[in-house]
Curated annotation (Swiss-Prot):
Its main location: membrane. Disruption phenotype: The production of sorbicillinoids shifts mostly towards tetrahydrobisvertinolon. It holds the Pfam family MFS_1. It comes from Penicillium rubens (strain ATCC 28089 / DSM 1075 / NRRL 1951 / Wisconsin 54-1255). InterPro entries: MFS (IPR011701), MFS_dom (IPR020846), MFS_trans_sf (IPR036259). One of its GO terms (molecular function) is transmembrane transporter activity. CDD domains: MFS_Tpo1_MDR_like (cd17323). This is Major facilitator-type transporter sorT. The chain crosses the membrane at residues 52-72, 89-109, 121-141, 143-163, 183-203, 211-231, 280-300, 324-344, 366-386, 395-415, 427-447, 457-477. It is found in: Membrane. GO terms for cellular component: plasma membrane.
Length: 522
C-alpha cells in the first residue's frame, strides 16, 4: 500500500508533499521512507554548482589540515633556539600531529561524535573550532612539552576532515560524477604536506616559527567558517531519519527509513561500538582493504619521510637556507599536478565511456593505478641516485616528479575503487585506510634522520622505493581478478546486495509514482 505525505504545517526543509512511501503506517507495517526520484532532500539531487562548492570547501579543509601538519617541519632551527631540543624531539611534533589523524576517529567513536549517528555537520563545527584553539595555543607555547601536546590534540581533531570530507563527497555525487570530485579531493592529503614546507620555510625564516602556526590557525579558521555557513547536513541515512521523525510528528503514524528497515534499528551504544571497531574489522578481515591500505600507507609514509629527508639532502649537504630548502618539494608538487590532470582526463575520456555503456564496475577505476604503480619506484629511485652534491640540484628535483605523479595515480583510483566496492560502508573503509596510513605517516619521520645519516642519502631514499616496487602488482592483480575477490569478501558482497535492494526499491517506487500519475491523468 502507498501513502501520500500529509499536508501538515511542518517546515522540514527537505520533505515535500506528494512523495509516495510504501507501507501502512503501523507498527507491523510502517511507511518506508526513502529518497524519491528527483527528491530535493537528497543531496545527490542538489544543483551542480552547490554540490561543487560544498565539495571545494570540504577538499580545502583536508588541504589546510595536511598543510598544517608539514608546515611545522621546516621550523627546526627557530624551535631549537627557543627550546634547546634535539632534532629527534622536534620531529616528534610532526609525528604526533599525524598520529592524531589516526587516533581522532577512534576517540570520537567512543564519545559518540560519529557521522553515522548525528551526521557530518556537527563534526565539522566541533573539530574546526578545536583545531583553531589547539593550534593557537601551540603558537604561544612556552615550553616544548606544551607545543607537542597541543599539536597532538590539533592533529586528533584534524583527523575529522580526512575521513568526514570524503564521506561528504560520496553523499553528494553518484558514481558517474564521483570520480572527478574524489580525484580533486584525494589530491589534497598529498599536495598539502608538499606545499606546507614551501610556505612554512619562508614564514619561519621571515617572522619565526610561531607565525607558521599562526598562519595555519588563520587558514583553518577561515575554512571552518566557510563550512559552518555553507555546508548543510549531507549524510543520507541521517537526513532520512530526521524525515521519519518529522513525518511521524506531523500525523502520528509510524515511519522508518529504508536503511533502518534493511539493517534494523540500532541503539546509540551499538552505533558507537560499530564505529569504534568496524574500521579495524575492515582493515584486518577484508583483504582488499588491508592490501590497499598498506599500499597507500607506504606512499603516505614516504611523503612524510621527505619532511625530514629534504632538509638533509638540500639544507645540510648543499647549504641551502630554510626558505630556499622548502622549494625542493616543487618537483613532487608538479608531479602531483600532472597526475591530477591525467586522472581527470582518464575519468572523462575512458571511465565515463564505460559508465555510459553500463559496463563500468569498481575494477574500471584501476587502470591509472597500474600506470602510477610503475611511476612511483621510477621517481624514487631516480631521486635517490641523482642527489649527489656533484650532480646539479635541478636533476634530482625534476626526477622526483614521477613520485608525485604516481602518488595521485595510485591513491585516487584505489580510493574510488574502495568507495565503489563498499558503498554504504565507504565511511568506515575510508576511516580504516586513513587510520592505518596516518600511523605509518607518523612513524616514518621518527627514523628518517637516523636512517639518512647511517645509510646515506642514496640507500635511505631507495628503501621506500623497494617497498613500492613490491606493491606494484596489486592494481594489476585486482583489475584482473578483483570481481571474483569482491564476491568472496563478506562486507563487499553485503554492500553490493544492499545497493541492489535499494535500487530495486527505488525503481519500484518510481514505477508506482508513474502509474499513479497516469491514473490521475485519465
Amino acid at each position: 500500500m502507498s501513502h501520500t505525505e500529509p499536508k501538515a504545517p511542518v517546515n522540514t526543509g527537505e520533505v515535500e508533499n506528494g512523495h509516495l512511501y510504501d507501507g501502512s503506517g503501523t507498527e507491523d507495517d510502517p511507511f518506508i521512507v526513502e529518497f524519491q526520484k528527483d527528491d530535493p532532500g537528497n543531496p545527490m539531487n542538489w544543483g551542480q554548482s552547490r554540490k561543487w562548492f560544498i565539495a571545494a570547501i570540504a577538499t580545502l579543509s583536508v588541504f589546510a589540515v595536511t598543510f598544517t601538519s608539514s608546515a611545522y617541519s621546516v621550523s627546526a632551527n627557530e624551535v631549537f633556539k627557543d627550546f634547546d631540543i634535539s632534532t629527534e624531539v622536534f620531529i616528534v611534533g610532526l609525528s604526533l600531529f599525524v598520529l592524531g589523524f589516526a587516533i581522532g576517529p577512534a576517540v570520537w567513536a567512543n564519545i559518540g561524535l560519529r557521522s553515522e549517528l548525528y551526521g557530518r555537520q556537527i563534526l565539522w563545527i566541533i573539530t574546526h573550532i578545536a583545531m583553531v584553539a589547539f593550534l593557537g595555543g601551540s603558537a604561544g607555547s612556552q615550553n616544548v612539552a606544551t607545543l607537542l601536546i597541543l599539536r597532538f590534540f590539533a592533529g586528533t581533531f584534524g583527523g575529522s576532515p580526512l575521513v568526514n570530507s570524503g564521506g561528504t563527497i560520496a553523499d553528494l555525487f553518484p558514481p558517474a560524477q564521483r570520480g572527478l570530485a574524489l580525484t580533486i579531493y584525494c589530491v589534497a592529503p598529498f599536495l598539502g604536506p608538499i606545499l606546507g614546507p614551501i610556505v612554512g620555510g619562508f614564514v619561519s625564516e621571515s617572522v619565526g616559527w610561531r607565525w607558521v602556526q599562526g598562519v595555519c590557525v588563520i587558514f583553518i579558521g577561515v575554512v571552518g567558517i566557510l563550512g559552518i555557513v555553507f555546508i548543510p547536513e549531507t549524510y543520507g541515512p541521517v537526513l532520512l531519519q530526521r524525515r521519519t521523525h518529522q513525518l511521524a510528528k506531523a500525523d502520528g503514524k509510524i515511519y522508518v527509513s529504508v536503511l533502518e528497515k534493511n539493517q534494523g534499528k540500532k541503539l546509540p551504544s551499538e552505533v558507537f561500538k560499530r564505529a569504534l571497531f568496524r574500521p579495524w574489522i575492515f582493515l584486518f578481515l577484508e583483504p582488499i582493504v588491508l592490501i590497499a591500505s598498506v599500499y597507500m600507507a607506504i606512499i603516505y609514509g614516504t611523503v612524510y619521510m621527505f619532511m625530514g629527508a629534504m632538509p638533509i639532502v638540500y639544507n645540510e649537504d648543499r647549504g641551502w637556507s630554510v626558505g630556499i630548502g622548502g622549494l625542493a618539494f616543487l618537483g613532487i608538487a608538479v608531479g602531483i599536478i600532472f597526475g591530477l590532470v591525467y586522472a581527470i582526463w582518464d575519468n572523462n575520456v575512458r571511465y565515463m565511456k564505460l559508465f555510459a555503456a553500463k559496463s563500468a564496475n569498481p575494477e574500471s577505476r584501476l587502470p591509472p593505478a597500474i600506470v602510477g604503480g610503475v611511476a612511483l619506484p621510477i621517481g624514487m629511485f631516480a631521486f635517490a641516485w641523482t642527489n649527489y652534491p656533484s650532480i646539479h640540484w635541478s636533476v634530482s628535483i625534476i626526477l622526483s616528479a614521477p613520485f608525485g605523479f604516481g602518488c595521485v595515480l595510485v591513491i585516487l583510483p584505489i580510493m574510488n575503487y574502495l568507495i565503489d566496492t563498499y558503498t554504504i560502508y565507504a565511511a568506515s573503509v575510508l576511516a580504516a585506510a586513513a587510520i592505518f596510513r596516518s600511523v605509518v605517516g607518523a612513524v616514518f619521520p621518527l627514523f628518517t634522520t637516523q636512517m639518512y645519516h647511517n645509510l646515506g642519502i642514496h640507500w635511505a631514499s631507495s628503501i621506500p622505493a623497494f617497498l613500492t616496487l613490491l606493491c606494484m602488482p596489486f592494481p594489476l592483480i585486482m583489475y584482473r581478478y578483483g570481481e571474483a575477490v569482491r564476491m568472496k569478501c563478506k562486507y563487499s558482497f553485503e554492500a553490493a546486495e544492499m545497493m541492489r535492494k535499494m535500487q530495486l526499491q527505488q525503481t519500484a517506487a518510481a514505477t508506482t509514482t508513474e502509474k499513479d500519475k497516469d491514473s490521475s491523468s485519465e
